[in-house]
Curated annotation (Swiss-Prot):
GO terms for biological process: cellular response to phosphate starvation; phosphate ion transport; regulation of DNA-templated transcription. It catalyses: ATP + protein L-histidine = ADP + protein N-phospho-L-histidine. It is found in: Cell inner membrane. This is Phosphate regulon sensor protein PhoR. Residues 98-166 form the PAS domain. One of its GO terms (molecular function) is ATP binding.
Amino acid sequence: MLERLSWKRLALELFLACIPALILGAFVGHLPWFLLAAVTGLLIWHFWNLMRLSWWLWVDRSMTPPPGRGSWEPLLYGLHQMQMRNKKRRRELGSLIKRFRSGAESLPDAVVLTTEEGAIFWCNGLAQQILNLRWPDDSGQNILNLLRYPEFANYLKQRDFSKPLNLVLNNARHLEIRVMPYTDKQWLMVARDVTQMHQLEGARRNFFANVSHELRTPLTVLQGYLEMMQEQVLEGATREKALHTMREQTQRMEGLVKQLLTLSRIEAAPALAMNDRIDVPMMLRVVEREAQTLSQEKQTLIFTVDEQLKVLGNEEQLRSAISNLVYNAVNHTPPGTEIRVSWQRTPQGALFSVEDNGPGIAPEHIPLLTERFYRGDKARSRQTGGSGLGLAIVKHAVNHHDSRLEIDSTVGKGTRFSFLLPERLIARNDA
């Protein structure tokens, strides 16, 4: 086993080189000259080995050092061992960097590594999507040149990273940005897309504002009549009018609460098993009678129903969807309108539609009709007691049945609401 180079080994090597000179000097004479020749030869041999080592280090691409003898053997072997250890460390470091990058790529956030001055030296794939960075083209670019937002520049300039920065991009995307210094003069920037969270927060605020607005009117009416009753005794027609109005407002609040509970129940419902057999034709007969009562013969109702077409699904949700579409057509069309309700089988599945020849809906209202509390004709909705929740209930109910609500309308010609249940949900007649 080789050992490290020592003074004893060097001295022994010098002594062995001088032995021939001592022997020759003892027999021939001129000992100093022989010793000088031996030392010179030893120096030449060391110089030759030094040149070989230099060639291997700077020119030769071989991983194995040149063979050595004498005192050069442990030195060259030690260099070889050191090189192998460095190679192993580089391999481990490369594997560690690869695992780090793989982990960073799987993060649900955009990650950017920069210098303290903002020069980018790495980013993950999500950063390229969210921040529109190009890697490796943007390597070395200052991030302030790529994200040109004054609030972002001020955030980096102030260097107070105790709180995240909420940044709104030009495409209306909301980002939450955090910056963490993690080594000397290097920063780790993490950007999270919180657009959906902001939308949900906005929807929550709008929801409570709309609920408060919807309840304020009937409560104000009730409070007014109660104060009137407290101050004076109402008799005859005035009393009947007050009671009728309070009853209407109470029913309006009750209807609103019921629809809110229905919508909440449908939204929170887990995935449906789709095993319940639903007799839609019988359901439509009940809806037709109720719609005729609601219409009071002001509109013409025409029902075209395939009496053999039954489906699988959730009966309560499907009833909510069908009844809301039919009642909306009655409530939101003027007298004399013809309303056609159809339940037919098609090659793609079971198609339900409600079509009228009423005034139609303006195009700008159609994408918003299924939003909670949205009402295209607010004046008419107030007259009919509409809450703006019916189509939201329909949308979620048909979505649970792997379908979607389609709305087609032309101003002055009429409107058509429909949804198509997939073929696999059609019940067999022998079931």
